[in-house]
Amino acid sequence: MSFRTLSAILGLLVIQTFSEQNPLTVPTIEPSGINYTRLFSNEMIFTDTWSKDSWNGLTTFAKAPPLRCFGSDAGVLYDVAVLGAPFDIATSYRPGARFGPNGIRQGSRRLGIDRVNVPMKIRATEHIDIVDCGDVPMILVDNKVALRQLELANAALLARPSSHAPEGKSLAKDGKFHPRILTLGGDHTITLPLLRGVAGIYGPVSVIHFDSHLDTWKPRPMEDSPWLPGEEIPITHGNYFYYAHKEGLLGPNNTNIHVGIRGALNRWEDYDDDYEVGFVISHADDLEDIGWKGVVKMIRETVGDNPVYISLDIDVIDPGLAPAPEIGGITTREIKKIFQGLSGLKIVGADVVEVAPAYDTQDEITQIAAANIAWDMLALMAKTPLVA
């Protein structure tokens, strides 16, 4: 036995003997007047003073109140629910987005739902009640079952009444006011069950899709497979809009728009398929040619006065600011300016997807970018009530 090891053992014995002879006690009242019993009680530990620090309390999105939305808190009303969708088994490249909801929440620790969003010129909680419902349990061995779990959970939240009823006629088909859902993904496949939910409440919606890829690819039969002739590739994060179009979930007459497109195509005909699905395209290069104001003009002219769903794939951002496979992307400042230009649109729901913390930098720049974008989405929802 080395001298260092022997010294360490003797040191531990001394510490243990001292602690047994001098047990730690917390005095009720110190000479300074501090009440330690109260200080370490539930009364103080769970007060706002402690929980609002970025390093304290539960890690909900931007310190939103946590709710058991599918359990004991099912009767609590709110205007916007943050919902996690930990799913990544329909990705075509690197998995890891199942950890995205937690990563985005971690990136939001310095934000707060009750803080003033200076660029958006609003304090969201002065207009809407925001809660965090946690994550939907999504099985990781069966795509269909997992997406069905999300669809049912999303529909259950949307069916409830919102906590505020603005003046005017509701956009919803039943004439009632319903909460909105901000979903944290998860690979982009999750947008399909989310669109099913909002379309069930509002009818077809115009989609503003921020992404480097079209995600409207037609599923192709596996003609080259001798074992699966004629079998079709199932729903993935690259073709969910094709299925959304087939199901009648998207706004008609090309009232949907992609923003930030720059990824490679499989064939030139992909553009024709995309137009058939119902999208207008704004490429990433448009930011250089017509600026963010020109892109905003394109978006507003495309979606008109329709109910709008915003879906943002984090790879729309340049990889220098949010590491992802496609170079030449939009900056976070340009995204924020575009969002400012969307004020007044009737946002019925939104998602931020494809955040994979395992591929982020040590500084968590992707998670921080995604969290701030989601925070701006809340501001957009707070700015405009869903009235006709």
Report residues per predicted region.
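Fungal secretory targeting signals
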Residues: 1-21
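Conserved alpha-helical scaffold segments that buttress catalytic/binding sites
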Residues: 22-388
